[in-house]
């Protein structure tokens, strides 16, 4: 959000706090993530949604090696972010995309079953993002001969969130905020992929796994996404599911152009 300078008034601040804390608005259920302009600073909607987080691994080392070459680093990040955004943005149930540093996250929602359900489309985005990292590494290595391969951890969660509009009323500074475990869990799953589970790019919650058997991901072998996920028992999060599945045609390009 861009800043829009406005003098701070302490008395107005106290009034705003009291107004927010004493608000009695009830929150309704919704099949989809509302548009920010359809919300006020006093209401909100409960929505079932899937969240995906895609985060680079080894970016600290990357800054150390390419940090002095700021133009090179900028090109690398732009290429990575542009393609992760392009992937999640290609799905109908993707309703919001955020970029923070080298992490791209997105929210998927909609009362849709089958191939276009939020969970299935978030998993499809995961498979494409995983394969796209191989394509990017091919491109990076051709550009910088001594380039060390990059990896991205991908986390997906599904659950109920309260969506509210938050910001500073009257300033134009506003954003949607998702309250609930789904965003936090997706971030945590992302934090496990290619870190604690060093050989797995994708980590999802139990709720995602339970909804992953409703779509044939591999037509030839009649496999669902459940067939590409393996259960792990995590000390903090209980049952989580990890995998390395990827979109075949994207990955094939990377293999053929190494």
UniProtKB/Swiss-Prot annotation:
RNA-binding listed as a keyword: no
InterPro entries according to UniProt: A/G_cyclase, Nucleotide_cyclase
Residues binding Mn(2+) 1: 55, 102
E.C. number: 4.6.1.26
Compartments where found: Cytoplasm
Chief subcellular location: cytoplasm
Substrates-to-products reaction catalysed: UTP = 3',5'-cyclic UMP + diphosphate
Signal sequence range: none
Keywords: Antiviral defense, Cytoplasm, Lyase, Manganese, Metal-binding, Nucleotide-binding
Quaternary structure (record): Homodimer.
Protein name: Uridylate cyclase
Organism: Gulbenkiania mobilis
